């Protein structure tokens, strides 16, 4: 059992070190940074069945921080945030959180879509993805 624990600990440590080795430095400015990448998972089925939407995501090559304006364009590694639009509504909201999960509650019953945009500090879009799902939520009466 002791050997198993040591082996698992070594594997976990190597995984963490390998992940950090490819991470961007926050000390030295990076020239020619790779483009930001957005990885989005489908909503978690368990909470969705209960009417709560959990959309997990990951952003690479960009730090999500609550900063804005033209001066932020010169920050390295690159900074930005998310713009989220639900069901093509004419408005969106900015997400500066670092939870890596979008949570929506109270969605009415039916098919929905969420547009997730990775933007720079001035709102210019780097990349985007749309997630579609069916909510079993309450039926809305007109």
Model-predicted regions and their roles:
Residues 92, 120-128:
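Short acidic/polar inter-strand loop motif in beta-rich domains
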């Amino acid at each position: 059992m002791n050997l198993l624990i040591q082996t698992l600990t070594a594997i976990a440590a190597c995984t963490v070190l390998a992940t950090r080795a490819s991470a961007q430095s926050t000390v030295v400015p990076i020239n020619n940074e790779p483009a930001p990448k957005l990885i989005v998972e489908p909503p978690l089925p368990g909470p969705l069945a209960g009417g709560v939407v959990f959309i997990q995501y990951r952003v690479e090559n960009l730090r999500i921080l609550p900063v804005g304006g033209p001066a932020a364009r010169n920050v390295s590694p690159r900074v930005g945030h998310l713009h989220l639009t639900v069901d093509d509504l004419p408005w969106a909201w900015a997400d500066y959180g670092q939870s890596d999960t979008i949570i929506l509650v109270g969605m009415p019953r039916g098919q929905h879509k969420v547009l997730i945009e990775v933007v720079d500090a001035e709102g210019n879009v780097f990349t985007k993805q749309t997630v579609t799902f069916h909510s079993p939520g309450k039926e809305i009466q007109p």
